[in-house]
Amino acid sequence: MRMRHKPNLIPRMERCADWHVKEPEALRGKWREAFPEYKELRLELGCGKGRFTCEQARRCPDMLLLAVEKVADAMVVAMERAEAEGVGNVRFMDKDAALLPDMFAPGEISRIYINFPDPWRKTRQYKRRLTAPEFLQKYTALLPEGGQVWFKTDNRPLYEWSVESFTLCGWKLEPMPEGTPMTDYEAKFTEQGLPIYRVVATRPTVPPEKLPDVSEIPVPAAEEQEDEEE
């Protein structure tokens, strides 16, 4: 479902400037130098309205959570939420996940959260999924040895496709612990009694420079899904 355009977007973002990183590319390789008070940096791809973001940051005060959300109308709501709730160990970036290598050097991020991403239902769109092999290769380069991706979705075909994609790319899979923070979507789906599919994937042990070319990794087969009504 598309968000409605937020009125006064620019002034609202300016009021939350302390939470907004406008040029993350300038901090590539320098994040720990810029934020020395935090023991680790974690990344969230697609923060939506920030419910998960703020709760996860509160639970881990010695961690800086960097939330990437390409839809500025959603991101401003998340920033306002962080400001209102006094959550200081989170920063937001209105960028596309495809640009992650421009923003972070290898090994800078200890963990990546992907919560309820766009399933990109059409066959021609599968490579745009955040769990497609091309993205997984990017994550492997960004994460240190033992680094993980925590993935949640309500879309079973996407989940099954993602599990196969992780496996093809050499990631080790394990169940996600219970009691992780919820997104707004997750809370709504849980209230309705709908299933949520979760998995934790640990990056391959192969050094990033020895990763196979992404063109050598097959894209998992999947049936095209029908679009949901908005």
Report residues per predicted region:
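Conserved beta-strand/loop positions that form the S-adenosyl-L-methionine
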Residues: 45, 68
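Conserved glycine-rich SAM-binding loop
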Residues: 48
